[in-house]
Amino acid sequence: MRISLVLMSLCVFCCTADAGVLNFTGPFDVANWTQAMTNGGDGSFDLTNAPLSVTLFGSDNGFAPIASDTRFSITPTTGWFIGFDWQYSTADFSPFWDPAGYSINGVFTQLSNDAGSQSQSGQVRNLLIVPGDVFAFEQRSRDSAVGRAQMTISSFSATVSSFSATVPEPASFIPVAVGFAAFGVRAFRRRRATQTR
């Protein structure tokens, strides 16, 4: 009985153990991300503090309202849960004109608050990215004028469970086999004990 419990605990521990990435390293190294500006914007990126943080600067080159995005994107080949802290500021009249956030496959999720202060911050945790998703940090500008906004991403982390990988490693099946063996031994002993009574 005790051996079965130990084996089951070991199985649960091994199956839920995560491979982790801290900051912009490994598969999330800044060299693996794509930098893009849309619609002729003059946004930019500051990677000098990488791997600890990256900063996206929005566009501010328009004399007429021109929407433009500054986008920092990656397409992982493995499923990940990611987390990060974000800090935002704008020199525009209002955060409304320069929303910041992230997108998954082009679907934008705004983090900055249009009605909030010129400086804002927050954190995102346990955001699921599945293999093949295009994930991007985005600093948008609705007018590309009157003042530039920026968003800094720090404390980036990513974890992947052995079961969320695209192709499970053979080693990940070992804890499962051990768990099934423990249940089998326990069931066999119970059945045998019942028959001898």
Predicted regions and their residues:
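Sec/Tat signal peptide C-region and signal peptidase I cleavage site
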Residues: 15-19
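Hydrophobic alpha-helical segments, especially transmembrane helices
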Residues: 3, 187-191
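Positively charged n-region of N-terminal signal peptides that target proteins for export
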Residues: 1-3, 169
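A short, hydrophobic C-terminal helix/tail in secreted or cell-surface proteins
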Residues: 169-188
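Bacterial N-terminal signal peptides
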Residues: 6-13
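Mature extracellular "passenger" or substrate-interacting domains of secreted, surface-exposed proteins
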Residues: 20-166
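Cytoplasmic C-terminal tails of single-pass
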Residues: 193-197
